[in-house]
């Protein structure tokens, strides 16, 4: 393939689109982990897609920017100005939490970093539609009191980046 050819919706051939979901008000440790994760993903050439807001989203975009990478924020409201200052591309959707569907569908694989119910909804949707998920200090799932081994869980951002990039590489769309 030449440099300008497109493959499906992933953009230039071989460029993974990695979604990052996470808490808007995380504890400081998660902020540090998310920033390192963003840096690692950008260093690997991934486009990082997130909700574009505060907390984990700001931290991951800060890491992406520090490494000279590309981040895309799918904002819940109607204003580009509501995005965090590290976003490469701010896309206002006007969809509120409905943007979670866009985040999952735009991603070849997803990393969940900490998070609340919004992150849980993104994990569930990704699993439902077959988008690979990697967890980093996030939700664990149970069904009828039994653990569900639905996705791998990383111990640190380097492992999370490796796992999600491996998963994204296996996706054919």
Give names to the regions the model predicted.
Residues 45-48, 149-150:
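Short active-site oxyanion
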Residues 12-28, 39, 43-44:
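Generic N-terminal amphipathic, Lys/Arg-enriched alpha-helix
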Residues 143-146:
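Short acidic/histidine- and often glycine-rich active-site loop of Leloir-type glycosyltransferases
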Residues 11, 32, 39, 54-129, ...:
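Acidic/glycine-enriched connector segments
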Residues 90-94, 136, 149-163:
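Short acidic-hydrophobic, aromatic-tinged amphipathic segments that line or gate anion-handling sites
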Residues 49-53:
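Active-site nucleophile and cofactor-binding loops and adjacent substrate-binding regions
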Residues 107-110, 154-173:
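A charged, well-structured terminal subsegment
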């Amino acid at each position: 393939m030449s440099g300008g050819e497109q493959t499906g919706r992933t953009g230039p051939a071989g460029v993974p689109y990695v979604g990052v979901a996470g808490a808007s008000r995380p504890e400081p440790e998660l902020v540090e982990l998310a920033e390192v994760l963003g840096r690692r993903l950008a260093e690997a050439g991934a486009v990082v897609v997130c909700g574009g807001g505060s907390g984990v989203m700001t931290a991951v975009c800060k890491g992406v920017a520090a490494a000279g990478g590309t981040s895309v924020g799918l904002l819940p409201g109607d204003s580009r100005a509501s995005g965090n200052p590290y976003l490469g591309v701010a896309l206002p959707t006007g969809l509120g939490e409905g943007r979670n569907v866009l985040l999952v569908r735009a991603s070849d694989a997803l990393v969940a970093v900490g998070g609340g119910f919004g992150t849980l909804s993104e994990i569930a949707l990704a699993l439902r539609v077959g988008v690979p998920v990697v967890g980093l200090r996030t939700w664990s799932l149970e069904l009828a009191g039994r653990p569900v081994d639905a996705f791998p869980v990383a111990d640190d951002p380097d492992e999370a980046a490796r796992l999600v990039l491996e998963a994204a590489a296996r996706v054919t769309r």
